[in-house]
Each structure stands twice: as C-alpha cells, then as structure tokens.
Regions:
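A general structural signal marking secondary-structure boundaries and capping sites
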Residues: 55, 95-102, 139, 164, ...
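ATP-binding pocket architecture of kinase catalytic cores
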Residues: 9-18, 22-125, 129
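ATP/Mg2+ or Mg2+-diphosphate-binding catalytic cores
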Residues: 248-268
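An alpha-helical support segment within catalytic cores of ATP-dependent transferases
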Residues: 99-172, 184, 266
Length: 268
C-alpha cells in the first residue's frame, strides 16, 4: 500500500480500513478502495474541506490519492449531553452558510452511489432530478422498481413545491445518518465521510438524522433554538428520506423496497 512506507506502525481494522502511526507519533486513519473510480476519495476530501470552516469538527485530510485517503485519527469516545447540544448548535451554524445555487461544482458520492451535483437555482427541480428521479431511474433500469412505482415517483416530483417549503441552498453534509456523527476521544462530536457534501436543503440533513436511529432530543432542541427553521420539519422527513431509501434500494437490494413503496403511496 502507498502509505506504508511512511508510517512507523500499520494495522488493519477491517477490509480497506486501517490505522497507522507516523514516525512523528501522529495517528492516522486510512481508507483504501481499489474498486472505486479515482474521484471517490477526492470527493470526500473536497467535502470535508467544504465542512471544515464550520464549528463542527471534521477530520483533517492528510493525504488523498487515486484509491485511498489518509485522515486525522479522531479516536473514539462517548458524547455527553453537552457534547450533543454543542453539535446541534454546530449543525445549525453549518446550515447558516448559504450558497448561490443548489449542488456543487463536482459530482459526489452517497455511499457507493454517484451523486449528480450539477448546480441548479431551483431546489425543487434539483431534488427531483438530481436526487429522487436519478435514483428511481437507476432502480427501474435494474428491475428493482416497476412502472407503477415510477409513475408514483414522477407524480411526487411534479408536486414537491406543494409538499415542501421553499428553502435556500445551504451547506449540508448530504449523508447525515447517525453513523456519520462520530464521538471523538474527548467526546466532541464530528462529522465524517464527506463524499455527499453539497449545497442543499437543511431539512434534508435533519431528516436523515431520524432515518436510522437519531440523536437525543437535546441535540434537536439546541439546533432549533439556534437555527431559522420551520419546526414542523419532522412532518416532511419521510418524503425527504425517500432519496436515501431509493439509494439503499440500489445499493442493498429489495429489502428496502417496502420502505420505498410506503413513502410512494403516502405522498403520490
């Protein structure tokens, strides 16, 4: 592996995930994927750079190359109630950073799926075309969705402006499930895995935080106190999470089909 010649200690945590110690004693976290395109880890490095100016901690990028990335090792600890409150305020601050358009100047990755970030001034069109329909068409082409499913999805996309409030494009993580909120060695919470970062809807980040488990109530209370956001956002979370359910359907197969269809029936 490319980095091994420059480290004093090197160990594998699991396939493609390594911890190492440099000769100067700095601990680093290394991810390697030879099965992904060259921009996979570049997207993560770019995303972490976009997030880095916000109060929420992100790992420093030490090195990135065609098939890997070396990051600051944040360690692993346990977050306190105060840490969660600080993270809520930090995410609110992140979402205060507005962009001129939705998207980003390069494509991203949500898990192992490419994410089209072609900039768009219309958030409803961006979410429909670059998120919902992109994943829906991929699933249909692979035989995971049927014609009726696509008709329902297209109906939803045509009426997004009736079901969701108009929101500005703000800096978002884009893949903000609980697994990407990391408790550092000192308990401080950090955002990791930045490949899906773009300018999008703040509500979409909040919604995904409720998809696979969720932070304590104090996190959301701190967020809502600090942010200018419609506090009824939870009512729209299922619709916003349809993107991630479709993505999981494409990545992991039919076990996610029931969840996708539940949302399609509810909103179509």
């Amino acid at each position: 592996m490319k980095l091994q010649s420059g480290v004093a200690e090197f160990g594998q945590l699991r396939d493609g995930i390594h911890r190492a110690v440099r000769p100067d004693g700095v601990r680093i976290f290394v991810k390697v994927r030879h099965d992904m395109p060259a921009d996979f880890f570049l997207a993560e490095a770019r995303g972490l750079a976009v997030l880095s100016s916000a109060p929420l901690r992100v790992p420093d990028v030490i090195s990135v190359w065609e098939h890997g990335i070396a990051l600051e090792d944040l360690g692993r600890g346990r977050a306190s109630a105060r840490d969660w409150e600080n993270a809520g305020r930090g995410l609110a601050d992140l979402h205060c950073s507005a962009g001129e358009r939705f998207g980003l100047d390069s494509r991203g990755w949500c898990g192992d799926s490419t994410q089209d970030n072609t900039p768009d001034e219309d958030g409803f069109h961006f979410f429909a075309e670059r998120r919902l329909l992109a994943q829906g068409r991929r699933a249909f082409d692979r035989g995971l969705l049927e014609h009726d499913d696509m008709r329902q999805l297209e109906s939803i996309c045509a009426r997004l402006c009736e079901m969701l409030p108009k929101q500005p494009p703000v800096r978002v993580h884009g893949d903000l499930w609980m697994g990407n909120v990391h408790a550092c060695a000192n308990g401080e919470l950090a955002l990791i895995d930045g490949g899906a970062v773009h300018y999008g809807w703040a509500e979409a980040d909040l919604a995904m935080l409720t998809l696979f488990g969720e932070p304590p109530a104090s996190f959301f209370c701190a967020y809502e106190t600090a942010a200018k956001i419609d506090k009824t956002w939870r009512k729209r979370a299922a619709l916003l999470n349809l993107y991630h359910l479709l993505n999981h359907l494409n990545l992991f197969g039919a076990s996610y089909l029931g969840g996708v269809r539940t949302v399609l029936r509810r909103y179509s």
